[in-house]
Amino acid sequence: MKKYLNICNIYILLWCIYYLQGIVYASGGMISQMTLVLLMLISGYYFIEVNIRYRIPSFLRVLNVFIGVMTIYGVILLLDPLPLIGLYTTHQVSKLEFIKSIYISLLPIYSMYAFTKQGILKIESIQALTLVLIISTTLSYFRAEQEALQKALEAGSMQEEFTNNTGYNFLQLFPLLFFWNKKPILQYALLAFIFTFIVMGMKRGAIMIGLVCLIWFIYRTYKSSKSNRSLIIFLTSIAIICGVAYLIDFYNNSEYFQYRIEQTLEGNSSGRDSIYGSLWQYYINQESLINVIFGNGAAHTITAIGVFAHNDWFELLICQGLLGITIYIAYYISLWQNVKRKRNNDLYYSILSMCLFIMFASSLFSMSYNSLSISIAISLGYTLSNENSTY
């Protein structure tokens, strides 16, 4: 029992408790607030410790800059006496949400890095934590379904199927499956479970990213396996047959999924093209060079066109200008450099390269830098901490 009572497991358990708000306890209440405060204190402590104690890889150095810049913008937003209100609404948007979402997304990477350096976070514990995270993500999925159904009923709609953003959280569980390489049968069972929920979520971006991750996962597990290649081929064949059968059945029995596929084939981006076009016109028509370089301030997209960008790059361009874009490009370049240094280690290379792809692709279809889950933090923290080459 004692070996499970360490700061790492307690930290991840607290994240699971936080994710379960609205399922086992009320959202936004005392429990969730106290849990988040405790998590931020622990995360902040390890952010400082990692930077003081260790010679960190290039990605974390760039991440330091990114977090620092976003903190400055977040503080300026909080100090602004004017309320944050959308262009076409009188509803106020929480100013605290901007910096809170970034801290929740990015600070856990440092904690996982420190836990690995200290020898607390090991593959055996990651395997157990993977199961816990799959369970909590599944519960979150059904909570989101119930909330969407309730809103539809309140609006007088008879709609019973919805897109579910939890599909992106399932997507971020993918890299953790590489840690199960010595248990291929269970590994592929978990793979099937995760991908099923990605499809059920009906987020087209998540499904497309998931398909690429699926191909990469199969390729890397086959290439890195020396003694179980026949089993890998067999499991892959079973997965393909079952997957195709499931997709056909799901398509035939889900009118909403058919509608989403038809939208994709017709090039319908759910209004994203209009949003991006409006944001681009807003940016190029700015007269102030300061706004072009440094942006208009945190969360400015909602005051500029009435909605958030749903795309990291346009959100940064409008809010943090060329400064934000430049740092974000460096963010991905530095992570790619760390990926290349892992080529001599099959496990680390497979995990880190998939993390890079998920993060970058998500930044194009949705939001990434403020939406990373503890799953990605575990994968990044563990592999970056186990760097076995020079920085």
Question: Where on the chain are the PLM-derived regions?
Answer:
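Long extracytoplasmic/lumenal interhelical loops at the membrane interface
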Residues: 266-320, 344
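Aromatic-anchored transmembrane helix interface
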Residues: 33-44, 57-114, 128-134
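Hydrophobic transmembrane alpha-helices and their immediate junctions
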Residues: 52, 60-64, 228, 320-360, ...
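A membrane-periplasm/extracellular boundary helix in multi-pass inner-membrane enzymes
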Residues: 200, 221-263, 284-285
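Alpha-helical transmembrane segments of multi-pass inner-membrane proteins
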Residues: 106-108, 118-148, 161-220
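Transmembrane signal-anchor hairpin modules in multi-pass inner-membrane enzymes, especially those
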Residues: 1-78, 181-185, 228, 341, ...
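Hydrophobic transmembrane alpha-helices of multi-pass, membrane-embedded glycosylation machinery
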Residues: 37-44, 192-196, 207-220, 332-335, ...
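Membrane helix-loop boundary segments at the extracytoplasmic
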Residues: 15-28, 320, 349-389
